[in-house]
């Protein structure tokens, strides 16, 4: 495990019209290496998870949590992953009652697993922290207010991972299955991005909507007003 770093993040800060320092750009370098499968490292009572949540490490992860020695799961620099893997990691976290923390970047599958913690917080330190929660379509302000609060996060993820696949006669060859629709809706780069950037005045929190066309350049995402991650339940105090 490498120590946390700012590798891959491009950050620029500038004063807005109100004179407050705000986040103006956040990007992941195009030259960043492909995401590796999840790796686990136990550091005392903290289990550090880095890499993509693809399900390959779920058994080891579950075993670690059921041992009773882990109090906090720390996600560090995790990108991509599947909705199924997100659900499996989230279920294990929820069942064990551990806390979760993000140190660096936690995108897509990692973000939903992060929300399953008894408490879920951004880690301290000089790094830029960020999570991106995939959505099937742009959420309204009313949906944002409840979408990831408490058990709603579990229900939202379930939209991407249907558990019932009852066999039905196929009416037309072009008709997609419900399972197919749900999986097609899971786009790791399409979602709501929450960031915390260190400044001389403390951390600045911002929220953005990313339509998936931004690629690795999150500075192209649209900033959302009145979307404080604490008020929305994405982060706990």
Report residues per predicted region.
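N-terminal secretory signal peptides that target proteins for export/translocation
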Residues: 1-15
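N-terminal signal peptide c-region/cleavage motif recognized by signal peptidases
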Residues: 32-33
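STAS-typified acidic loop motif
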Residues: 37-60
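Terminal peptide-recognition signature
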Residues: 49, 73-74, 114, 229
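Extracytoplasmic/secreted envelope proteins and their assembly/folding machinery
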Residues: 58-62, 86-90, 94, 111, ...
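Short, glycine-/small-residue-enriched flexible loop/hinge segments at domain edges that mediate gating
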Residues: 70-85, 99-105
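Glycine-rich beta-to-alpha active-site loop
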Residues: 94-141
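Charged, glycine-interspersed solvent-exposed loop segments at helix/strand-loop junctions
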Residues: 139-237
């Amino acid at each position: 495990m490498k120590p946390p770093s700012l590798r891959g993040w491009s950050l620029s800060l500038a004063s807005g019209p109100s004179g407050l320092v705000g986040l103006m750009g956040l990007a992941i370098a195009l030259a960043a290496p492909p995401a590796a499968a999840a790796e686990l490292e136990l550091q005392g009572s903290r289990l550090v998870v880095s890499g993509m949540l693809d399900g390959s490490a779920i058994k080891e992860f579950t075993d670690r949590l059921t041992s009773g020695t882990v109090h906090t799961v720390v996600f560090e620099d995790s990108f991509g992953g599947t909705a199924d893997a997100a659900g499996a990691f989230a279920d294990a976290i929820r069942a064990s009652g551990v806390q979760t923390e993000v140190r660096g970047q936690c995108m897509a599958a990692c973000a939903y697993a992060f929300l399953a913690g008894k408490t879920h917080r951004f880690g301290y330190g000089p790094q830029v922290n960020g999570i991106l929660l995939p959505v099937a379509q742009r959420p309204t302000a009313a949906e944002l207010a409840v979408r990831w609060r408490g058990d709603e996060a579990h229900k939202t993820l379930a939209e991407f991972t249907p558990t019932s696949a009852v066999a039905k006669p196929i009416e037309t060859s072009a008709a997609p299955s419900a399972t197919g629709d749900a999986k097609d809706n899971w786009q790791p780069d399409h979602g709501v991005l929450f960031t915390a950037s260190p400044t001389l005045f403390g951390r600045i929190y911002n929220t953005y909507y990313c339509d998936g066309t931004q690629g690795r350049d999150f500075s192209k995402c649209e900033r959302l007003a009145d979307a404080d991650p604490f008020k929305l339940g994405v982060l706990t105090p």
